Amino acid sequence: MKEKVIIVGGGISGLTAGIYAQRSGFDVLILEKCSTPGGVSTCWKRKGYMFEGGVHWLNGSGSHLDLHKVWLEVGALQENNPIYFKDPVYVLKNGKADLAIWRDAERTLKELSAYSPRDRKALRSIFRDVKMFRYFQSPVEGETRILDYVRMLPAILITPRLWMQSIGYYLSRIKDPDVRTLLEAVVAPVNNAMTFAYTLSGFFTGDSGYPSGGSLRMALNMAHTFVKAGGQIRYNTTVEKVVDGGVFVEGELLKADAVIVTVDARTAIDKLFEKPLQDGWARRMRKLLATSQTVFVGVGVEADLNSYPKSMVFKVPFRDGGVDLSFFVVSNYARDRYSPEGCTTVTALFPGYSYGWWKAAKEDGTYEEKKQAVAQKFIGILEEQIPETRGRIAVVDVATPLTYQRYCDTYEGSYMSDWMPFTLTTNAPNRYRKGLYFAGQRTAYSGGLPPAVISGRLTARLLCKDFKHKFTNK
């Protein structure tokens, strides 16, 4: 008789663990709180406009990477969602000449240096660091070879230096404010500089594309792959407690030989078990975890913005919604069939530690009013920067950290962890003990989808080892 495995959460890590465990001979049930799979990697619709709430680029898009094999194994990438590699990657709209990051590193360096000759030396130094990461990739257990680590050695050797600097400090040597703003748009400046070099290198080396259909299409593909393998998913199901031998749902014990917790581990350690976990790693997580939070604004525009870049950096201050920013990034989905014919979906993220601000607004009754104020401020800026949108806004939607928390139970409404300078990641263990496992972004380094899928795969391997099953990846 097959061992029963219950997975708490149907996000990317939960789906991944479920697919591999089901293929490897377990009887797997995924319990998902929401009505759709994917967790924080999701899209949603308002009045015919689809808003991308998860993927903005996908590490593992490049077919030369081990991570790409994993995305294929779990069925995330199929014929129904081919990868699109936007080029330019980012364009700074500053009222003068547009400034761009292209997928060609030499072209980008040449244009930035021509725009700001006084920064030529600093730019060459930064781009040398970025070049060191051209062979760097997320290691995948059982796939990444010794030769791969040898090729990654140049990046590994400079990582300590970059890890000790924030992106903001690392880029402070750039004197021209436009060039500096464009580069800071790649990754939030509070993170360590290694994340900047790695991310920018991905754009320059044929990675970090966008899957057609976005987050939801990927998640639906994975859910279909899981069910096709024989697994079961129960949506709209909240797990109340994880106990020895199973989980409680609506007061009923669902028995299992093993439980894999893939919801936010920071939330789980305090709320999901009979008593809060007090292991050393759990105490460190409570003390040190730095969360990535954002305010999301999406609008539907009754205008075709196909002539505008896919990702635009607006060098315009935004001080509202608990954030104080000197610039922000706007995503243009005119070419992605995310809206009615002749119309366009436009979204923007406003990162910052705004959870407390929004929580206070909820408590004092001004939450909806402040969401509306954020929406109107964004619309005003959008109409100024892109005149075609003026008076053409058909729908607007705002998601705050409280929104993410309500739907996904993420700690402080965060969508991943920040990786700050001088700090190690505060990770939950993939294997807590035989029969109880963790997977998800809080079990690995920061970075969105890659640690989610890699940790789900690793946890399935550990499960197989404990129960003496052969790990099957196809």
State where each predicted segment sits:
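N-terminal glycine-rich phosphate/pyrophosphate-binding loop and immediately adjacent elements
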Residues: 2-132
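Short loop/edge segments at beta-strand edges and connector loops
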Residues: 9, 235-237, 243
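Active-site/ligand-binding neighborhood in enzyme catalytic cores
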Residues: 131-229, 236, 407-420
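A glycine-rich dinucleotide-binding beta-alpha-beta segment and adjacent secondary-structure elements
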Residues: 177-190, 387-446
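Mid-domain catalytic core of redox enzymes
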Residues: 240-341
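C-terminal segments that line or cap access tunnels to active or ligand-binding sites in enzymes
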Residues: 302-402
